[in-house]
Amino acid sequence: MPIYKLEPATAKGKRYSVVSPEGKRTNFGSATGSTFIDHKDEQKKAAWIARHSKAGENWEYSGRDTAGFWARHLLWSAPTLRQSIKYIKERFGIKVRT
């Protein structure tokens, strides 16, 4: 099971960063915008998913080193970060450490 490390973003304007087992850093999420883990609004979540699904982002396991994957699954899947981390482990077999 691959282990990814979740940290504060290193890129200006981004919220979080994940570091892959190979050491690749991916910054994601707007530092100023709110996400599902903040507002827990199902309508905003549906709108975000609809808008970003048209962008051709890879939300499957093969996209695990992309910002879109992490934004979708950590910030827009469950009402809390802890629940999102559990979801990622169950769905993709990826362990996320904070």
Regions found by a protein language model. Give the residues of each.
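Arg/Lys-rich, low-complexity, intrinsically disordered basic segments
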Residues: 1-98
